[in-house]
Amino acid sequence: MKKIALVALVMTVGAPVCAEVETTVGADVVSRYIWRGCDLGEAAIQPSLGVSAAGFDLSLWGSTGIVRFADTKEFDITLSYSLAGASLGVTDYWFSVGPEPEGRYFRYDEKATNHVFEAFAGYDFGFASITWNTNFAGNDYKANGDFAFSSYCELSAPFSAGGADWTATLGVVPFESPLYGTDGFAVTNISLTAAKSLEITDSFSLPISAGVTLNPCSEMAYFVFGISF
């Protein structure tokens, strides 16, 4: 995804540079919001804001429907650390729909919050990457009242072909999860996406993408187009 990058040097008076901070600002417009093989709504705008330094990254991400305003709104905060291909992090997902009927953000009561907290770990081998994600708190309970610890494992491989950057992805849910709608181990995400820059003028191009996603568990298929800014 192409981002607008602003680089700032953090300095003390009369001292040399002590850290380099990079800020990224961007937005995507997608024809449908598909996440890990799950359908989360129709066309949406998805802004992002991130700050990174010394391997640490703090990012904000959101999604708001632009066709059906009633679609669930989302606001995520992720803190992660990366070193030599390995990464660890925590994400706070917030949804406008959930156990908290008024959708209030600052409600963290057990079994009455619209937040979901997830920890993740991954490794990028260069030719492929793998990530494991597990919920550890928030709105993720089974029908019997037990916390589900919903988990998702994803393997992705980037490659170039035909003048485009492609990504092939395989995602699985290892055990029962109310969040992903599975009763046990299930393949929920088989996707292939191509991205390239569409040249508008000699000095301006627009990053676009298109991809197909199959969810064998729900027996659904999706084709999504996106524009990045």
What feature does the model see in each segment?
Residues 1-22:
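Cleavable N-terminal export/targeting peptides
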Residues 18-229:
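Outer-membrane beta-barrel proteins
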